[in-house]
Every structure is written in C-alpha cells, then in structure tokens.
Amino acid sequence: MTETQHIFRLTVHRFMDFPLSIYSSFTQLKPTPGLKKIIAVAAISGVSLIFLACHLKRKRGKKKINAPQTEPGQFILQCSRHVAEKGSSCSSSRQNLTLSLGSIKERGSQSHLNGDLCSKYSGSMQSLASVQSCHSCACINSNSWDKTDEDEINIPVTTPENLYLMGMELFEEALRRWEQALTFRSRQAEDEANCSSIKLGAGDAIAEENIEDVISADFIHKLEALLQRAYRLQEEFEATLGASDPASLANDIDKDTDITVMDNGGDFQQRDTLSIASTDSFLSAAELADNQDMRATCGLDSLYHHALYEEAMQLAEEGKVHCRVLRTEMLECLGDSDFLAKLHCIRQAFQEIILQRENRIFLMGTGRKLLSALIVKARKNPKKFEDAYFDMMSFLEQPESWDTVEKELLSRGMKCMNFYDIVLDFIVMDSLEDLENPPLSIQNVVRNRWLNSSFKETAVTSSCWSVLRQKKQEMKVPNGFFANFYTVCEQLCPVLAWGFLGPRSSLHDLCCFYKAQIMYFLKDIFDFEKVRYSDVEHLAEDIMKCLQRRTELTVVYTGEESARRPPVLN
C-alpha cells in the first residue's frame, strides 16, 4: 500500500514540474528572428482556429434549436399522418374527376335505370385512383423529409388541365384493363371451342355447357359495347382542350346534343356550346328532351338482347356478308366482323324504311332542301340543281328503271342494291374521301397566292366540269343512273369543292358542318348505344329518329325552316 502511494506521489510531482521545465527551457532559448516569426504564425493560427470553431458551434446550435425534438415513434406517426392527409387530398381530386367520368358514361344508357352498372365501373376506377394517388403523394412526401425547413416543397398546382390529364390516365388504364379482359375471354372461348371436340358427357353436362356459352357470349357482347362507348368518350375528351376548326366545333355542337349528364335531381347540365358561326347555340330544350327520350328507348336493356346482331355476326364470321369497301375505322367499329354484322342489320333496316312511301318522300325532300341551301349559301341560283334533282328522283321512282340501275352499279363493284350501299357508301362517303384528296391540279390552283379568290373559284369549277365531262363520255348507258347523277353533280360538285378547298368563309363552315353531321349520323347507326339491334323494326325506327334529329339540327343551323315544302312527284 505504501509503495502505491509513493508511485502516485512521484507521478503527481512530475506532472506539476512539467510546465516549469518547459518554461525554463523556453527561457534558456535565444529569441532569434526566425523563431519569433514561427511563434507569431502559430499564435495567429491558433486564435483563428478558436474563432472558427466557435462560429461553427454557434451555427450548429441554431439548427438544433429549430429542429423539434420528437421521439422516433412520434416522428413516424406524424409522417404517416402527413402522408395520409396528402394522399386523401390527391385521391379525392382524382375520385371527383373519376365520378365525372362515370356520370358521363351513364349518359348513353338511361342514367336512372342503368346507374347500377355504370356505378360499378366508376367504383373500380375510384379504387384505382385512390391507390395510384396514395403512392404518388407518398413519394413526394418521402422526398421532402430529407430537406430542411428552409427549403420550400414544390407541390404541383391543381389546375383543370392537370385534373384532366390525371383523369385521362385513369381512363386509359381502365381501357387497357377492359381490352385485356376482352382478349383473355376471347382466347378462353377459342380454347374451349378447340377442346369441345374431345368432351364427352351426359345430357345435364351438355346443358350446363350451353348455359355457360350463352353467358360467355352475353358478357363478350356487353364488354364490346362498353369498349365502343369508351372509345367514343375518349375521342370526345381529347377534343375538349382545343377546337379551332369548324369540324371540331361541329363536334362540340354534336356533343352538346348527345352528351347530357343527368344529376341526382334529374336536371340537365348542358355543356357550354360553340357555334361555327360564332353565335349562340341553336339547341333548344325540346331537342334535348327528344334526345333523352330516344336514349331511354336505347338503354342498357338493348345491350342484353341483340338477336338481330348475333344472327348477322354468325353470317359475317361464315363469310356470307360482303361489301364494296370496309369502313371499320371510319365508323369506329370493333373489327371487320363487327362492321359486317352491323352492316347486314342496317341493310335490312333501310329496306324496311324504303318500303314506306312517306319515308321516301322525307328522304328526297330532305336531300333537296339541304343541298339547295348549300348552293344558296354559295350565292348561286339553285334552280338548275333542283330541276336535275327532280329528274333523277323521277327516274328512280320508275320500277322499270332499276334493271338498268342495277347493271350500272354492279359494274362499279356494288355488292347490294340498298340505300346504304348506293347513297351513303357509294355517293356520300366516296365523295367526302375524294374531297379530302383532290387532284393536284386543283390543289395547285387553290394554293397559288398570286391568284385572287374569284379566279381560283372559276378554275376549280372548270376542273370539276372537265372531270365530269370525261366521265360522261365513258358511260355505257346514255340515259341511265349515272347520266342523271352526273347532271346533278355538275351543279353541286363545284360548290362543294370550293366550299371545302376554298378560303375560310360561311360556305366553308357550312360544308364542314354538313360533313360532321353526316359522319355523326353514320356513327350513330353503327353504335349499340344509339340504335337497337334487337330486330329489324326497332332498328329501322331508331335509324329514322337519328336521321330526323340530324336533319332538324342542320335545318335550324342553315335557317331554312321556311323552305319546308315537299318534293313534287309525278
């Protein structure tokens, strides 16, 4: 014990004597100029380091004061609560837009009677929106945790355009899911058909298989109808962010008449309308009511009963339905078989329509009235056109003329002597395609900046007449269908060509409006939502309603209500 104390005392004495020994050694040194400089530099450096350390310590102390001291569990709870609040706000905005999508989907299928099915679709989209919004908002907040409070968090501004884009993303995701379901179900049906040859069973098993086949076919038809409506809705959404040309503006007018969303109170919420002539909308409440009545007759029940369409689909798949030109993409059909099946049904419906004399009078009078209004808009006298038009109608009213007409049309590749094939397909749609791709000679004249408008119009008229004159020389029947048709075209084609290819004017707007209404009528009659493919009578009735509605819109737009005189028939 004494030795330990002795060692400790020696250690303390040496520690106390160490500064004295250092001081004595410094006093013995001779202060040379170099040593003084070294000591001065060392002193200054030491003082600088002390001040720098104090400054850094002060700054670190401020940060510690600003940062709230929380326990790990509380910090995780606050972060999760913050994420939940942000996720709920984002998901609520997307769900609101999704609800609007669901409400717009309900407009084509009798919103009160058919709200359950559409609510299922919108409910699935809401769940998808909530999942995606929570993930996206959680990522944003997780990135902001590592930042200090001095840095501002950049949150995207909520604008109608952003909400629109978010809704379109969700809508496209739903479309992909439906397409996958349709593809998967079709593939499964094909596999079952391939394996049906080796299946053996009793009568009960065969009956169960037949019931499953019926349910499967019904599901596929409903899914196809839903996809067709969704494609139409997607195109209408894409056109909402800008409409500068008359065709798109006519599209807006059409959507104002076709898309009327009924809310819980039953009131119509009509969207803002855009008129081609920059005037107020000419749609009336009565027209919207008629539109809703027609939609009530073409509700969701028609999606379950397509007896006429199913029979036509079997014929189309067997290759027994023929046409001159496939219009699958133009008329927004799901495929060539879908187009041919609907075409077969529409041919039967038009055959039923033409059998009634009042329908023939309506069709002839409507054509004369609208085309005469177009010529009047071009500031020309429609007298020659009306005379040629009446001569052609009188020729077609004679039963003995149809043998010649059939021979002429068969030589042009006509597959069926029907109103759709002759008027809508051969005359109307082919003419619209020709006007979209005019000859180079006409294009060069119209694009020439050194020519005035009157000279361009004269040149376009001369080009049309020369083409028609050449076609007349190639006719095999001098007084047949094409002779009368070319006589009508001599008065009408120059007006149409100048209206579509000429400068922006009231004639150009009217031509674009006519084209838009024609295309929407054609798409309407190929749409399960607008017409009923249950039987020929209902389909013919719905086609006539669509035609009358489009005609009324066009007549109101052209301001030709006073010119409703019936055609003179011999």
Swiss-Prot record:
Pfam family, one: Miga
GO terms for biological process, alphabetical: mitochondrial fusion
Transmembrane residue ranges: 34-54
GO molecular function: protein heterodimerization activity; protein homodimerization activity
GO CC list: mitochondrial outer membrane; plasma membrane
Coiled coil: none
Record-stated family: Belongs to the mitoguardin family.
Assembly mode: Homodimer and heterodimer; forms heterodimers with miga2.
Annotated function: Regulator of mitochondrial fusion: acts by forming homo- and heterodimers at the mitochondrial outer membrane and facilitating the formation of pld6/MitoPLD dimers. May act by regulating phospholipid metabolism via pld6/MitoPLD.
Protein name listed in UniProt: Mitoguardin 1
Lineage: Eukaryota, Metazoa, Chordata, Craniata, Vertebrata
Gene name of the record: miga1
